[in-house]
Amino acid sequence: MTDSIPKKPLKKGSLVFVDKENYIKSIEALASDNDLPNYVFEGPGEILSLKDEYAQVRWRRPVPDVWLKLDQLKEYTH
């Protein structure tokens, strides 16, 4: 038996930020600008939609929504 608390799944409406370590190691990072703005790592962004292993995230800034893999996102708790 483990004492770890199960991780809550991210869902539509969840507030999130990008986990920098997971993003930098991803294949998506190789295909994108490696100098992402700080706000994606600080959060919060809101999940608008989910499809398979991806989430559409809207940031609280006048920028386009982006699709990111769920394993690159963490729940924003501040």
Swiss-Prot record:
Any one annotated GO CC term: plasma membrane-derived thylakoid membrane
Record carries keyword Magnesium: no
Enzyme Commission number: 7.1.1.-
Location relative to the cell: Cellular thylakoid membrane
Reactions accelerated catalytically: a plastoquinone + NADH + (n+1) H(+)(in) = a plastoquinol + NAD(+) + n H(+)(out); a plastoquinone + NADPH + (n+1) H(+)(in) = a plastoquinol + NADP(+) + n H(+)(out)
Primary localization class, coarse: membrane
Chain's role: NDH-1 shuttles electrons from an unknown electron donor, via FMN and iron-sulfur (Fe-S) centers, to quinones in the respiratory and/or the photosynthetic chain. The immediate electron acceptor for the enzyme in this species is believed to be plastoquinone. Couples the redox reaction to proton translocation, and thus conserves the redox energy in a proton gradient. Cyanobacterial NDH-1 also plays a role in inorganic carbon-concentration.
Name of this protein: NAD(P)H-quinone oxidoreductase subunit O
